[in-house]
Amino acid sequence: MTPLDVTIRRVERADLLSVVRIERACFSDPWPYDAFERLLDEPAFLVAEREGEVVGYVIADAMPNHGRDIGHVKDLAVHPEARGEGLGRGLLRSALARLRGVGVAVVRLEVRESNAVARSLYADEGFEPVRRVSNYYRDGEDALVLVVDLAEWTTGA
């Protein structure tokens, strides 16, 4: 779980510069500001805040799918100086709970095959690999597509 001094809450427009700074610190091919701006209204665009500073974020959306809505974790990052404290897990769990609350049944995400830390977190939360996508990332690295059934996640969490 997240440390007691951290609050996980919905993103606000005023948080976007901090979110972009974290994105740039964490990823070699960061999203631009306007990508985050377009996602402000997603049901699970959440930030982790400590002492007034945003230290991490998660973005997840929901898509109708014939009565079995599908969620998609689009982005999850924790500032390098705040890693190892459970913030990523807290953000992920909060996003999954929000998606479940809006009727999502299954959640998917893509992760770099080489990102062992993220893959371990996702496996701990019940995500299972369903396929590999060759050359998914701009640098040519493959992605693994992972999924979790939220009914199973809820009973196992």
Regions found by a protein language model. Name each.
Residues R108-E110, A123, E128-V145:
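Conserved catalytic-core motifs of GNAT/GCN5-like acyltransferases
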Residues M1-T2, N135, G140-A157:
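Terminal substrate-recognition subdomain of acyl/acetyltransferases
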Residues Y33, E37, E113, Y136-Y137:
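Conserved beta-strand edge residues that scaffold enzyme active sites
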Residues P3, R10-E81, L92-S94, R98-V102, ...:
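Acetyl-CoA-dependent GNAT
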Residues E85, V102-A105:
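Short coil/turn segments at alpha/beta junctions that flank glycine-rich nucleotide-binding fingerprints
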Residues H79-E81, E85, E113-S114:
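Active-site acidic-Proline motif in GNAT/NAT acetyltransferases
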Residues G88, L92, N115-A118, N135-G140:
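Short glycine/proline-centered loop/turn elements that form peptide/ligand docking sites
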